[in-house]
């Protein structure tokens, strides 16, 4: 499900049984990220899918990238793998920052 920054933030903050995935590259992640995010590079496909296999599919997953495109694709893969509650930050990290929300780094 695609959510705008405000809705994604509010839903994520109220969801205590969730995980946040940053699917950007390590270099992008090192420049700044959303608090609590785990970096899993979407472009490293073998490790991406391997990492997903270690996540409880019952947990809600909040996924973002730079602009929302990679994270959308990641969400589609996750749904195909059986994840039920997957939320894409449609404006990505750029939209998050533009809205003035807190980041690390």
Language-model region placement:
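Rhodanese-like catalytic fold shared by cysteine-dependent sulfurtransferases
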Residues: 1-19, 26-60, 66-105
């Amino acid at each position: 499900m695609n959510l705008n920054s405000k809705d994604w933030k509010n839903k994520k903050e109220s969801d205590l049984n969730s995980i946040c995935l940053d699917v950007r590259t390590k270099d992008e992640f090192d420049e700044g990220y959303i608090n609590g995010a785990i970096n899993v590079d979407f472009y490293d496909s073998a490790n991406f899918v391997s990492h997903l296999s270690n996540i409880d599919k019952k947990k809600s997953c909040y996924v973002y990238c730079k602009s929302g495109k990679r994270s959308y694709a990641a969400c589609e893969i996750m749904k195909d793998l059986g994840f039920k509650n997957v939320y894409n930050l449609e404006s990505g990290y750029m939209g998050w920052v533009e809205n003035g929300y807190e980041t690390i780094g």
